[in-house]
Amino acid sequence: HSEGTFSNDYSKYLETRRAQDFVQWLMNSXXXXXXXXHADGTYTSDVSSYLQEQAAKDFITWLKSGQPKPE
């Protein structure tokens, strides 16, 4: 892959992974009856940090697996 294609594929992968993780996180949060209240800024920052970290871990795992990119 050229660097531009790799970056584009990586961005698409991260967007998809973040969306999946966020939906899963919401579903898990909805299952818990007691939810801790956060200020909107803190909540958004926490979710973004979690999703970025998780997407990076998943991408590294995917790179190590040598699998072709998902279409």
Curated annotation (Swiss-Prot):
Subcellular location: Secreted
Keywords annotated in UniProt: Hormone, Secreted
GO cellular component: extracellular region
Domain of life, source organism: Eukaryota
Gene Ontology terms, MF aspect: glucagon receptor binding; hormone activity
Induction annotation: Produced in the A cells of the islets of Langerhans in response to a drop in blood sugar concentration.
One Pfam family linked to the record: Hormone_2
A GO BP annotation: response to starvation
Main location: secreted
Keyword Transcription: no
Recorded family membership: Belongs to the glucagon family.
Miscellaneous remark of the record: X's in the sequence were included by homology with American goosefish sequences.
Protein name per its UniProtKB record: Pro-glucagon
Gene source species: Ictalurus punctatus
Lineage: Eukaryota, Metazoa, Chordata, Craniata, Vertebrata
